[in-house]
Amino acid sequence: MASDLKSKFLHVYQTLKSELLNDPAFEFHHDSRQWIDKMLDYNVPGGKLNRGLSVVDSYQLLKGAELTDDEIFLASALGWCIEWLQAYFLVLDDIMDGSHTRRGQPCWFRLPKVGMIAANDGLILRNHVPRILKKHFRGKPYYVDLVDLFNEVEFQTASGQMIDLITTLVGEKDLSKYSLSIHRRIVQYKTAYYSFYLPVACALLMFGEDLDNHVEVKNVLVEMGTYFQVQDDYLDCFGAPEVIGKIGTDIEDFSSWLVVKALELANEEQKKVLHENYGKKDPSSVAKVKELYNTLNLQGVFEDYESTSYKKLITSIEGHPSKAVQAVLKSFLGKIYKRQK
């Protein structure tokens, strides 16, 4: 069933792409159509597609029955809107961070003929979302709520990115700016809203629910998103590269839960080691930081955090009156609890 759903989901991508390449609001010529075609294929469908597929999964769990072809198409279209939004964030994020690779291939802006055209491509990706929503949801009673939801989540994500950028200004490796509360705010706004809340909120709207009645669901999903990012930081340092599929850079980079915890637990001498070595790319500095993490037993600290977070999340989920909503939230948690990559 899962692979069948994924193939249907990918088929919807082709349909949406074809519609966008023939959007009557713009007079395409061969070169521009070819550019958009290549840009979309390079940036939109390349990831794990978890966010997009979660809309379909969540809607199915809310409905509690087989979905019609029309429902699969609409839930998939909303899922793809999230993947489009994600592509827009990543294309611009990579330019801001000066990154080299994304999903195992060069970042879009690193391609010889792309460069800073990628900034405009990011804007086009962002503007495709309302085009898709208008074409397929304009007649739905929840259309305005959908548009509002995407606008709000985009604002929250961009604001989270801003806190991250101004806290970790390149060249100003100032650990004193960093604390658990700042880390939490960055994660909440930059990751949790669009990765965890948005897919479920889309499914709830499509199911006819009023999001104002589901503030508790939002809170649980934001907590889940925070837990997911802490896992990510942990795996970046302690996960096996062949399992996580990338080489960790958090000791060289910056905003990691591990360094925040280390600062909290370290004595003055250990803090000095951190301040002198954190954020540097040379292997000896990275090794010193990792050695300090081991001395502070951050693996044990993370395991405690993981089990406490899990128990709190389960308690919150089981307090929800709707069994269908519980199933949606438990399905999300099941995908990430104790993951290795």
From Swiss-Prot:
UniProt xrefs under Gene3D superfamilies: Farnesyl Diphosphate Synthase
Required co-factors: Mg(2+)
Annotated pathway: Isoprenoid biosynthesis; farnesyl diphosphate biosynthesis; farnesyl diphosphate from geranyl diphosphate and isopentenyl diphosphate: step 1/1; Isoprenoid biosynthesis; geranyl diphosphate biosynthesis; geranyl diphosphate from dimethylallyl diphosphate and isopentenyl diphosphate: step 1/1
Protein's GO biological process: cholesterol biosynthetic process; farnesyl diphosphate biosynthetic process; geranyl diphosphate biosynthetic process
Amino-acid positions noted as binding Mg(2+) 1 in the UniProt annotation, renumbered to this chain: 93, 97
Catalytic activity, as annotated: isopentenyl diphosphate + dimethylallyl diphosphate = (2E)-geranyl diphosphate + diphosphate; isopentenyl diphosphate + (2E)-geranyl diphosphate = (2E,6E)-farnesyl diphosphate + diphosphate
Domain of life: Eukaryota
Keyword Hydrolase: no
Entry keyword Cytoplasm: yes
Enzyme Commission code: 2.5.1.10, 2.5.1.1
Name of the protein described by the UniProt record: Farnesyl pyrophosphate synthase
Organism of origin: Helianthus annuus (Common sunflower)
Upper lineage: Eukaryota, Viridiplantae, Streptophyta, Embryophyta, Tracheophyta
